[in-house]
Structures are given as structure tokens and as C-alpha cells.
Amino acid sequence: MADNDLKVIVKAKELTFHSFNLTSNCDRYPKKYRHSLSDKIQIKCLDIQYELLKANRINNVTNKQLRCETITNAITYCDQLLNYIELSMRLKLVTGKSAEYWTSMVSDVI
């Protein structure tokens, strides 16, 4: 983790690490949810990170609209991730307390 990373990028990296740890656990996410849910969660976290890194590289003065669109994409991906977390809780793959913590990590990124 670089010292000059924006706080939101650091939070997105922490979210990705946490999400990969949870969804890679076969006891928590059995094989039947591997492709339908856990892979989607992992990919969505990587997408969030990518969009934030991309937005950080866009010049805010010359390409303000593109930067705003990229940040909006990241926020939309966070919304999708929140839906996957809720689904995980409803399927009893994670506890309410775990989902609450995970949701707070997503909120830190938004």
C-alpha cells in the first residue's frame, strides 16, 4: 500500500481483501454458490477498485465529466455489492453481524 494512495482507494483495497477472504472460505460459501455469488462479489470488488484508480488518473480540470462518470460507476458497483451482501445474509452464508461490518466497509468507500 503506497503512502500517497487516496483514502478511498485504501478503503477499496481493504474491502477487496476482506471480501476475498470471506468468499474464498468454502465453509462460508459452498461450491454451489461459487460461480453464482462469490465470484460476482470478488469481481465487483475488483471493478470498484479499478474505477477508483482510473478516476484518480483522470485530470479533474480537463476531463471533469469523465471523472464524474467513472466515480459514478464505482458507486453503482458499490450498490451492486451491497445487494450481493444482502443476498448472502438472506441465504445465511454470512451472519447479520458479519453483513453489517461488511456493509460498513462498502459505506467507507462510497
Task: Report residues per predicted region.
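Amphipathic alpha-helical assembly/interaction segments
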Residues: M1-I110
